[in-house]
Amino acid sequence: IIKKLKSHKGENLIPYNSNWKVNWKRRYKNPYSDLEKFIFNSKKEVVEIGGSVRSYNQVMGQYMGILKFSSRVSKKLFEFYKTLPKDEKMKISMTDFLQKFTNETKFKFKTLKMNYDWHEVDTFNDFKVAKKYLKN
């Protein structure tokens, strides 16, 4: 995944798991549990990221927690972060931060589709699920 991301010519990318639904059903009895919005437009630009989901139509993929930014955009992100109130800095998730940055600066992040067997591990149960399905 990292090799594909590094070799991609795009500078400001948010890779996503296109096979998210299979893994979500393995992790949760209720697939809407812990699911977040991930919506992009026809130009493959992120429109919405993070936040509660009401239907699967709001999930075009799963944010993988991996990002690729140019040094110029990294500086912009850091400067934007410094403007947030201290209490918000301590609580904000990455998806909420990226959405807030996008909303307030009108910056567009591009998406990069990944078709790998990606497993998010937040809990011990997630670890057991990943271990069961990942090949050595």
Regions found by a protein language model. Give the residues of each.
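Conserved core of the sugar-phosphate nucleotidyltransferase
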Residues: I2-F80, L84
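Conserved alpha/beta core of the MobA/IspD/sugar-nucleotide pyrophosphorylase nucleotidyltransferase superfamily
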Residues: I49, Y56-N136
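Short, well-ordered alpha-helical microsegments
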Residues: I1-I2, T95
